[in-house]
């Protein structure tokens, strides 16, 4: 099933990259709707969820990895900063304090709720997810700096547009899409972990994973944050990193999951 999903996403990505090389600007012109509620929810909601997940992951592995306390604190601050950006009223400082309190309460609650044996059981999975996510973040960030592609919503005229297959050397961070790459790697990680347990529903599970990724790609184009090719590149980066890591997960976690033949 993983092989079929990889082939489908790779072929779809290649086709969409070719389409983006020809129609990137036209597609963005047609879909741009910055007031689209669903797209706004995905744009603002996913970074908030991701930072909360990071704080929880670091909090649950900190018992055996003291350096994770730094990550826990950093993720908590980033969550609070993101919350203050989304909810600036009545006061940004009040929002920051409330957000930090909520994250700390949730993290401490889970740390006390889970037994040492339960935390030891899930710790390898959390570490594997963090390794995948940060690999994707680093690759995406480096490419953003190297490409310098301007975002659609930052363009003042069509002359500023540049194709995805050439570095643009402009003051932009459009290529590739960070929202898409981080969501895709998260969903693909969940697919790897859930597939053995839900093997009879593997086709439905794969469809849900693809639907989530494609919805994020669509929302980023609608918001004018990225062109089609930017979102496809983000998806393919996540797919490549997931495929490389998944082979290691099979060896490490195969005996810890309810696998099906």
Report the location of each language-model feature:
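N-terminal transmembrane-helix/juxtamembrane module of multi-pass inner/ER membrane proteins
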Residues: 2-100, 146-147, 151-166
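Alpha-helical transmembrane segments and their helix-start/interface "positive-inside/aromatic belt" motifs
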Residues: 1-9, 123-130
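Membrane-interface helix-boundary motifs at transmembrane edges
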Residues: 2, 60-70, 88-90, 113-124, ...
């Amino acid at each position: 099933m993983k092989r079929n999903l990889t082939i489908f996403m790779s072929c779809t990505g290649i086709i969409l990259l070719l389409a983006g090389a020809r129609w990137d600007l036209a597609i963005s012109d047609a879909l741009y709707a910055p007031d689209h509620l669903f797209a706004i929810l995905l744009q603002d909601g996913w970074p908030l969820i991701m930072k909360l997940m990071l704080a929880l992951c670091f909090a649950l592995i900190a018992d055996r990895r003291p350096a994770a306390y730094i990550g826990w604190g950093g993720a908590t601050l980033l969550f609070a900063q993101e919350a203050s950006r989304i909810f600036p009223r009545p006061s940004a400082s009040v929002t920051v304090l409330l957000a930090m309190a909520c994250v700390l309460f949730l993290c401490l609650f889970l740390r006390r709720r889970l037994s040492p044996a339960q935390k030891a059981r899930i710790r390898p999975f959390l570490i594997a997810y963090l390794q995948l996510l940060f690999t994707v973040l680093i690759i995406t960030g480096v490419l953003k700096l190297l490409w310098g592609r301007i975002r659609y919503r930052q363009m003042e005229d069509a002359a500023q547009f540049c194709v995805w297959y050439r570095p643009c050397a402009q003051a932009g961070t459009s290529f590739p899409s960070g929202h898409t790459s981080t969501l895709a790697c998260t969903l693909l990680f969940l697919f790897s972990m859930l597939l053995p347990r839900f093997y009879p529903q593997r086709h439905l599970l794969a469809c849900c994973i693809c639907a989530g990724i494609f919805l994020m790609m669509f929302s980023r184009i609608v918001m004018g944050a990225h062109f089609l090719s930017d979102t496809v590149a983000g998806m393919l980066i996540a797919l490549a990193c997931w495929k490389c890591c998944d082979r290691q997960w099979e060896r490490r976690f195969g005996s810890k999951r309810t696998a099906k033949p």
